[in-house]
């Protein structure tokens, strides 16, 4: 079982089993069983993973559905649950959910999915490091302003006189 902590400091435990997958299907119309699929040509497909990563509202709805028995025990509504989910809490919950979903699968499938997820995480970490390096570059803001000026046709002096 994996866990995460929301922005109110509440710890939540994720348990993915057949009942959980059924509950998420019913409440969110999302099939966690297809988080990663292998296409006919043998290539991995992560359409659901992409959908969840691009829609934080759906992601938190899925997390709530997974945590629903615990939420019911604590009298936490989906609105209250969602209000405590932002930033690092969402990232931590996403990692825990993905690990727990992958642990649900039988050994052979689990091993393949763990490799796919590991590669995805390495790619994400490399992208994060590139972004940090770009932001640390002293010329970044000047290049950004220059590009915005080019795109809008406005210059800094024109912006100052318009204010």
Please name every model-derived segment.
Residues 1-10, 32-57, 61, 68-163:
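Charged interaction scaffolds used for protein-protein
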Residues 12-14:
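Short, isolated positions in well-ordered beta-strands
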Residues 16-19, 58:
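Short, well-structured alpha-helical interface segments that form or flank functional binding sites
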Residues 19-37:
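Short, surface-exposed, low-complexity cationic segments
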């Amino acid at each position: 079982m994996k866990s995460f902590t929301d922005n109110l400091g509440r710890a939540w435990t994720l348990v993915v089993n057949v009942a959980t997958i059924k509950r998420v299907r019913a409440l969110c119309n999302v099939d966690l069983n297809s988080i990663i699929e292998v296409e006919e040509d043998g290539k991995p497909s992560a359409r659901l993973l992409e959908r969840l990563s691009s829609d934080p509202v759906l992601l938190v709805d899925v997390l709530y559905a997974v945590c629903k028995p615990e939420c019911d025990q604590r009298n936490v509504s989906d609105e209250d649950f969602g209000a405590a989910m932002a930033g690092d809490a969402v990232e931590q919950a996403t990692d825990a959910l993905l690990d727990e979903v992958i642990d649900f699968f039988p050994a052979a499938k689990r091993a393949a999915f763990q490799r796919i997820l590991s590669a995805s995480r390495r790619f994400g970490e490399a992208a994060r490091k590139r972004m940090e390096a770009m932001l640390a570059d002293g010329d970044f803001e000047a290049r950004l302003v220059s590009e915005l000026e080019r795109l809008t046709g406005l210059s800094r002096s024109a912006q100052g006189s318009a204010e």
